[in-house]
Amino acid sequence: MAGIIDLASLAPTDTVLKLPHPYLTEYTVQRSDDKLFQLHPKEGSTVQPLPFALHAPHVRFSAPADLKSSELPASANNSLWARSRRSPFSDVRWESDAAAPTLAQAWLLLYVLFTVRPGMELVRLQLSGPGADVLSQQLREVLLGIAHPPPPPKSQAAAPEQATTETSSTVVVLRSTFWQGAGSPFGPRPVWCPDASPSSLPASTPLSQFPTTPLQHTITVASAGDPQDPDRYQQSLHPIRPAKPAPGAVIYSRWVPHLKETFSMVSVDYTDAEHLRLFHEWQNDPRVSQGWNETGTLEQHREYLRKIHEDPHQVALLAKWDDAYFAYFEIYWAKEDRLGGYYDAQDYDRGRHSLVGDVKFRGPHRVTAWWSSLMHYLFLDDPRTMWVVGEPKDTNAIPVMYDLIHGFGLEKFVDLPHKRSALVRCPRVRFFQLCPLGAQEKAVGGVNIGLVPKL
């Protein structure tokens, strides 16, 4: 299967996982006996010290493995019990004289398991050691997992999971809740979304330390964006939006295993010379201007970015691989956007526009990584976002195909003032069912319907 990493094939120095910004700690796995592994931080890799020990050197675990075909439930049985039994399992053990791993340490182990087997919707953790029952309960209470369900009455002949005791417990871990941030160890924000507060708040009390921005509606009257009728406006009723991240803040960071690089997004600072230079050079590239039509002088581009900076419904971003900037994105709240006038927009729908400025970073193996990461951020940033939307030109097949790969559906066609667009939408539930964060096949997300090879 695509994306699977064989733990046994990794050298002791190979990085299996790297934490997001600002820590960037790398981890390796080493064999402890014939079938079990231990996780170790790579010496000298940490950029910012962790607030606590995140790895448990005394814990051993097995690579995710599947039951023998003779042990699997009948394929016609699609109960939660049967789906759990068909999911891979991992043995997690610690000695009788050792403390159980903390919830944060268990989270790190799960991050490794979902990295080496990204296709697992569920994984059964078989916990063995003192305090296994408490750790199992903690995993359930932060919704990283659920109790292993009992077999249905007609399946009682099947062997049930071992009963929970103080030293033994089985918990079914959910990929969908893991990637939504369940159990993230560094505060209320999911680990891939560093605290990106407005500049007015001190670092000691970032925006995430306050309750989620309350719901309070307002009315916006804005240009309808019609070049044939510049005096036409549209009105929208929408929530007052959360404060925007400070210019220059890293708002998303994730290590991409198949590239062995960290993808990050940074809030654009229009007063920063490098940020302005990149935007200016890319927009004046004929390849980019064909789609964006934003060629101009340095001053015109500074003014363009300044207006976005002052617009509560938009955020301008630069994206990078490790330390190399390669792309520019604009993300927006859809209800008060031009697009919001063309469909029944929900209060927290979000959309995005993108361009790759550095041609060295083109290609499907990279596009699928940043495409999914940008969607991931939009769903994580505010848990009330139920839909991510887009409006690529109806004749521009490539972005529509990438959208289909990552869980979007084609809703309808809309006639914007300057183009006919395909209105595409991806619901939150579908994105986290698919979790398309690894290397993706050229097929419609979740089904084996192939797409044309020109990607």
From Swiss-Prot:
Coiled coil (residue ranges): none
A molecular function (GO) term: N-acyltransferase activity
Species annotation: Beauveria bassiana (strain ARSEF 2860) (White muscardine disease fungus)
InterPro entries recorded: Acyl_CoA_acyltransferase, Acyltransferase_MbtK/IucB-like
Function: Hydroxyornithine transacylase; part of the gene cluster that mediates the biosynthesis of at least 11 siderophores, including beauverichelin A, dimerumic acid (DA), Na-dimethyl coprogen (NADC), eleutherazine B, ferricrocin (FC), fusarinine A, fusarinine C (FsC), metachelin A, mevalonolactone, rhodotorulic acid (RA) and tenellin. This cocktail of siderophores for iron metabolism is essential for virulence, and more specifically for the fungal virulence in penetrating through the host cuticle. Siderophore synthesis is also involved in conidial germination under iron-deficient conditions.
Protein name per the record: N(5)-hydroxyornithine:cis-anhydromevalonyl coenzyme A-N(5)-transacylase SIDF
Similarity-based family: Belongs to the lysine N-acyltransferase mbtK family.
Enzyme class: transferase
